[in-house]
Amino acid sequence: MISSNDFRTGTTIELDGAVWRVVEFLHVKPGKGSAFVRTKLKAVQAGNVVEKTFRAGEMVPQALLEKATLQHTYMESGDYVFMDMSTYEETRLTANQIGDSRKYLKEGMEVNVVSWNEKPLEVELPNSVVLEVKETDPGVKGDTATGGTKPAILETGAQIMVPLFISVGEKIKVDTRNDSYLGREN
């Protein structure tokens, strides 16, 4: 159990048989009446966001999530298959469970698979990944005075903005949290 006073961004709780992650929280102490905590909760499985208010100090069941480092091995009939490299046990996740993470997911990549009650819920990517640029406009000499950017399509199909000097075939480092270019990779 966790007190509503201890809510922080990223805290996971159990409500109505589902796992919810605290996205935002605000402790409110009105002049009259008792204090309360106003939260925005995101359903880990479904992805929907709801607002919920808790009394200050209210005890809520905390969802204890397990993380396992698994390797993405292949796709089969729309499912993503991950393998535990120590036990060779396979875990399957649907495209909905993976969500936006699939735009940076490639075969052979190690990721954290988050489970609750031994059911896989979601995939956590590393903060940065190295991917090859598959398609981008050529940089024109003299265009770099303002340090502009151009769109690039990566090997996984993701599209991000890169500096003008990046060309097709280069490996770049991408921040998976905000879809931004971090630099070239050798």
Swiss-Prot record:
PROSITE patterns for this protein: EFP
Key words, A-Z: Cytoplasm, Elongation factor, Protein biosynthesis
UniProt GO cellular component terms: cytoplasm
InterPro entries with a match to the protein in the record: Elong-fact-P_C, NA-bd_OB-fold, Rib_uL2_dom2, Transl_elong_fac_P/YeiP, Transl_elong_KOW-like, Transl_elong_P/YeiP_cen, Transl_elong_P/YeiP_CS, Transl_elongation_fac_P
Pathway(s) annotated for this protein in UniProt: Protein biosynthesis; polypeptide chain elongation
Location within or outside the cell: Cytoplasm
Domain of life of the source: Bacteria
SUPFAM superfamilies reported for this sequence: Nucleic acid-binding proteins, Translation proteins SH3-like domain
Any GO MF annotation of the entry: translation elongation factor activity
Main location: cytoplasm
An example Gene Ontology biological process: peptide biosynthetic process
Keyword Acyltransferase: no
Functional description taken from the UniProt entry: Involved in peptide bond synthesis. Stimulates efficient translation and peptide-bond synthesis on native or reconstituted 70S ribosomes in vitro. Probably functions indirectly by altering the affinity of the ribosome for aminoacyl-tRNA, thus increasing their reactivity as acceptors for peptidyl transferase.
HAMAP family hit by this protein: EF_P
Protein name: Elongation factor P
Species annotation: Prochlorococcus marinus (strain SARG / CCMP1375 / SS120)
Lineage: Bacteria, Bacillati, Cyanobacteriota, Cyanophyceae, Synechococcales
Gene (UniProt): efp
